[in-house]
Amino acid sequence: MKAIYGALAGAIGLLACSAGALAQQNLDTFRIAIGGFGLWATEAPRLGQQAGIFKKHGINVEYYATAGAGESLQAVISGSADLSVGVGTTGVMGAFAKGAPVRIFGANFTGAGDLYWYARAESPLRSLKDATEKTVLGFSSNGSSSNTVAVALAEETGGKMKLLAAGDQASTFTQVMSGQIDLGWAAPPFGLKEIAEGKIRIVATGNDAPALRDQTVRVDIASLKVMTERKEALARYVKAYRETLDWMYADPRAIEMWAANIGVPVEYARKAAFDFQPKAARDFDTITGLDKLMEGAVRQKFLAAPLTQEQLSTLIQIVK
């Protein structure tokens, strides 16, 4: 009798596993490359997946980290990723102008107040006014939003500083602390602990470049193949994404989950989300400051000339 019950239990377990696998197979999967992995502004795919929001809409997301938004853009262009979130707008414009099969399907972040630049505590740099021709300021990768902001900050100093692609936040921090570069980029909560401990101090934020305050510096992108061949699934992804954004700012559990994901105290996570990345800056439907963004892209040589209205209409296709 025990053998019969054991066999029955095993069969039931096998059926449950099979049903779970079948349910997973019935979900539409999107592979997402994330440059600023772990940042609040790029955390919606992971949190929405963990909270079951995407599954509710028949979507499964597979996310992975890249060294920066530039690498994420290339992943979408090559087809190794379907989507990316938080990619520098000017970099996307430049790639599109060169014929890359990529489209913008939503805004990610407007303004630049969520990024800051820091120096070692013993550094003589206390503000951008202290920068010289020898000052090296780091950003993540070419075409990223930190690249756009770095250029704008350099312009505020009269073009004095040297700019360097320094990689992700951890790599940049190592370079600052070892003296390889003078100013490193970061987005909270990264660095808040070190600031509190007096190891580093903030020298500038994205808001020190006033021209960027009303510009949508980061966008969410999809491959042309996804936009044309998977419209219905992408619409469900966007519906789940919007629901996730609302939940992230309304439910305290979202902050707790994020803090656990990135291994920081909840108070640091809460400060990073609500002080540096308010929901107003996360309007998915509105991309602003395009003329200024294109001017910057031309100066940065991402664009040979501003995109035409027809080109912009082709590139930007907000999914409702």
Listing of model-derived features with the role each one plays in the protein:
Residues 227-303:
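Secondary-structure end/capping motifs
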Residues 170-260:
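Pocket-lining segment of extracytoplasmic ligand-binding domains
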